[in-house]
Amino acid sequence: MSDTLQKLPLFPLNLVLLPYEHLPLHIFEPRYKLMTKNAIEHNKPFGIILSEGKGVFSKGVKVCVEEVFKKYSNGEYDILVKGEEIFKVKGTEMDGDTVVGDVEFLPTQTGMEGPQFQKFQESYLKILLKFGVDRDLELHMKKKISFEFLQGLQLPLILKKEIININD
């Protein structure tokens, strides 16, 4: 883990996003419209973090806006974000109406290799074929990081919370 804390605007939602995962969002609240505008205009990331009751989960994922589907005249946005890095929140402060976290980024996974990975990859491809996924197999063959294998799966919130905590 890095000892350097970075400031990151936080967007609490009732979900856990994982690295490499895409999420379409409709941004309509004034404080998040401003945060989104800044992210788009200055190519700046923000963090998506699970909102739990009156608080927030201590971990989240840094996201970048990959695509702006629509910008409305009232400042609302339809966007697509992609999860990048897991972070741990060490503290928060308010910047106007936006919650800004002092975050520590956790180590990024590197690609898997070796005989054990080859066995895993073969099993993964067999499962895909068993369920009739026979398109884009080459794309599936290129996956090397565990989060890439989770793309497209509808996992329960509780399981995603466990997955994001594995780094600890």
Write out the residue ranges for each language-model feature:
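N-terminal low-complexity, acidic/polar interaction/targeting segments
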Residues: 1-168
